[in-house]
Amino acid sequence: MKKKLSKKYSFKEVEANKLLFWQENNLFKAQINSTKKPFTIVLPPPNVTGHLHIGHAYDFTLSDILMRYKKLKGYDSFIIPGTDHAGIATQTKFEKNLKVNAQTNRFNLGRELFLEKLKIWKDEQINYIHKQWNALGLGLDYSNYLFTLDPIVVQTVREVFVKMFNEHIIYRDKKLVNWDIQLKTAISNIEVIHKEVEQKLYYIKYLSQDQKDFVVVATSRPETMFGDKYLVINPKDKRYFHLHNKIFINPINNIEMTVILDDYIDIEFGTGVMKCTPAHDFNDYELAKKHNLEIINIMNADGTLNEKCGEFKGLDRLEARSLIIDKLQKNNHLLKVESYRTSVGFSERTNEIVEPYLSHQWFIKMDSLIKDTIKMQDDCNNKVDFYPNRFNKTLLTWLKNTEDWCISRQLWWGHQIPVWYHKKTNQIYCDTIPPKDLENWIQDEDVLDTWFSSGMWPLLTTKWNYNSHFFDRYFPTSLIVTGMDILFFWVSRMMNFSQYLVEKKPFKDVLIHGLIRDSQGRKMSKSLGNGIDPFDIIDKYGLDAMRLFFASCTTIGEDLNFSTERLGANWNYLNKIWNIAKYIENLDEINDNLNFEDVDKFCDVNKWILTELSKLTLEINKNMDKYNLVVATKYLYDFIWNTFASYYLEYTKVLLQDLTLKNETIKTIRYVFNKILIMLQPFAPNISEEIWLCLNQTNNSILLQEYPIINFEFETIIIDKIAKIILEIRKLRLEENINNRINLCFELISPNDAFYKSKIKLVNLLLILVNAEINEIKKTSSNNYTYELVIDDFILKTSYEKPIDYVFQMKKASEQLNYLENEIQRATNLLNNSGFINKAPAQLIIKEKNKLINLKKEHANLLKTLTDLKQKVK
């Protein structure tokens, strides 16, 4: 039975089962033994915490568009999907679920049972993510799916850790780190959210030991005073230089404090004197290392003050703050308090204020890794290409200022560090397998930062250490699409690991996109309530409309503002394409396809559309190869909506009436539209597939077609001129209210009259569309004409005299009458307004009175004209 397109475009019908159709035909799997050139995209692995947000949809859709494009271009093109165990995010969410649903916590369960339950929950989450991927219509190679805690990944991560440990790249040390007091773990910079908050600035008086001098220090964190043994001044500050090396007394615990010099201190900021708290401030920590200062930790892992804080021991640091201020005030050391706004770091997961905290952690020495990555980027033949290119410079700037990477986390969920400590000797054992006498050893309880395993993602997904055939074919991968917000945390890590482990770049290209913001340009957040669910968009506008929105609004490297108007416009665009397809479906069937040998004999209109199609394919290929989707979609939109639909298909309505042109025209229409569908496929795969299958009466997917590169080039200037003639005649009819039923006859005046005479048959054929014709062509003309249309190198003249349209004139007179009545009422109200009469300048009042007189005269004259017109109509 012949397949038919439904009468109306319904995205729900069109998009149903398309992904299943492609999957059943194995269109998204790697072709390991193919001779095709590979094009591999590694999907950024979403966290296994559940619901995919619009940022995920954006990221994944761009990857899918480019995968489909390359597949149509003849590549072995596929996407490798995966999910990330996401240590902190997953453990935090699961612990909340435990608390709500089971009224317990991980400590009650113990590590083994907790992880067992979490793995079951993780499997449910991954199944949900797979369903969401399918709902997004993504063509993923599930046969190569990977999870960052799969056994092969665990083994690989251990091997890499051991290698780096043995080469002294990984080391353990006590350093200052970002600390979440609720989770009791170190966290990365990306997990710190900075918010502007109002805080108090306390001005505290410090007396010298000999009672002869005092200084004032401003601090927002008086609770950290228990860790202070130094005051710091700028050596260029003449106010305080004489105090260098002098001893002052800490007013909270009476400990001696020494004044030291450092040009880090800003003379103009605050009082110019700074207290130094190395264990609880990153800048102070650097000062301590520089001057070899004592570092005193005054805080426990849960944010309470420790034994160094005397009577305040055991209190939360924020609770203790007010009590400490009370004590300072009673002792006359608090001089004043000011409010000010400042940026404070909060934990993304718990919303707790992040504390700089001194603790034993594992670190990676970054200097050698960074040098190798920078060297790679300096090699034009081996570097990773960034789109846009400015992000290469951004990345290199970051790398040059990178400190050693803290890779340990005080969690249970993740890659447990493969290090054991001897119970008696504290000897360290590091290997991929536990020590033989395991009963004498204790394994390090910490797990690795999620970015450690994610940093090896291109290596892991291409089976680096266990399938050389797959790895050699697909590594380096071709492309990764990601947001600028994780350029340093993820992209740079992948470059570091690949260069270190295999001395190759991990991918050839990186496409960087910005954030999706709301319609007002604001970042989406829970507090603003402006988040957008991609599945709500799909339900309302359809998957293809959303894909077109992402593609047509994506200027690489820039943020994207969400717009329901653009989504609605995309639906209209798809509906237009559907209606075009319906028009083509109803054309007479022509058995033979377009024969290129016959094209030279085609009429100029069909040659023109083939030439325009050739130009289109050139532009789209060029821009798609540069990942410039916004330009590619614009070219395609303009061609479909304007060139093809508004002009060419309109022309074909008269061409199809000519039996000598009918067959070639139907062939051309179908040929051009099929090429349009192939170019549309990456952006709107569902509608293009549905139309392709129906119009071509085939079971073979459009994805098996060849992406068009067409080289028709005909001289078709006459078609451009005809288009201008039609446009000008339509404007003339509209402006002069000339009925479309009236045939307009023109003379064409041009020095190039021979050219136009040679094309007159075609010109008049197409002018049927506007009920007009050219009945004479001359070089010059001296006759008088009613209308003249000046177009390019010719003039169209007609002596048509329009009959007086009394009804039209009545309509215009009535509209003007209404306008005058409104103006008269406005002027009358103004002159009756005592406020205006009393306050306005006399000159302005006179002007308004004269205006009212003239309005009334004009109204009276127009009323008489309207009465006369009504009589004539009768």
UniProtKB/Swiss-Prot annotation:
One of its GO terms (biological process) is valyl-tRNA aminoacylation. It is an enzyme of class 6 (ligase). One of its GO terms (cellular component) is cytosol. The keyword Ion transport does not apply. Its EC number is 6.1.1.9. It comes from the Bacteria. It catalyses: tRNA(Val) + L-valine + ATP = L-valyl-tRNA(Val) + AMP + diphosphate. A motif ('KMSKS' region) lies at residues 523-527. Residues 805-874 form a coiled coil. Catalyzes the attachment of valine to tRNA(Val). As ValRS can inadvertently accommodate and process structurally similar amino acids such as threonine, to avoid such errors, it has a 'posttransfer' editing activity that hydrolyzes mischarged Thr-tRNA(Val) in a tRNA-dependent manner. Belongs to the class-I aminoacyl-tRNA synthetase family. ValS type 1 subfamily. This is Valine--tRNA ligase. The lineage of its organism: Bacteria, Bacillati, Mycoplasmatota, Mycoplasmoidales, Mycoplasmoidaceae.
